[in-house]
Structure formats: C-alpha cells, structure tokens
C-alpha cells in the first residue's frame, strides 16, 4: 500500500465555512501530537515504523511531507521512490502506512503540523526507526535552513 491523501472539501454560507474529510476513517488512531518549527524550512526526517501507521494534517502554513517505503529497516535502499506531498490546511489528511518512513519540512514561517498515530507511545518507541535526514533527500532543492 502507498500513502493516500484524503482530500478535504468545504461548504460556505453566511455563517462561515465548514471543512470536512468525509472519506477518512480514524478508528485506528490512539494518540496525536503537534509540531511547530521555529525556523522556516526546518527538516524533520526520517522517522519510520514497521507496525505503526500515521495520519498527517497541516494545521497552519505549508509543508513538504514525504514518505518512503522501506523493505529492509536494517539495510534500507536509498534508491527508492519518494512520495512527495505539498500540503496546506485545506488539502486534506495524508495517510502513511506501516513499513514507511516519513519526514516534513515547513515552507512557511508560521506553521503547525499534526500527527495521528495507531500505537500508544510506549509501543511506538519499540517500533521506532530513525534515518539521517539526508539519506533520502527531496529537501535540498528547496534550500533547507536546518536539518534535524
């Protein structure tokens, strides 16, 4: 399975606007966390899981969010397809399946991105695989200011 972007829609009337993502099912979500970067173009990558699934929603600003499918977490190939998504708050929610690593870079100064996870924190840390932020590099073409 590949990452899926569940598109959001909206309806406006004289009261305001409602944004919705009706095709999305979050029944497997057990926790959430939000990230805000101090510097524009901060790269936070790569964070992978064999078991855990992620759903990603931009709450403020614009982000480049990327995901790579990993066959071998102990010896990953750096010559694999990078799934790239440029997301804003109105674009929808990105689903990242298990056996993927993901990363994000904020493209705006004011920014906020929310992650939804399918595992409790104590189980997630046992399924946590970190890779150097430049191991797969979709970021450099956008001149990042900081890699984490």
Model-derived segments and spans:
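Short beta-strand His + acidic residue motifs that chelate non-heme Fe in jelly-roll/DSBH
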Residues: 94, 102-107
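Non-catalytic, conserved peripheral segments adjacent to functional cores
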Residues: 1-90, 109-148
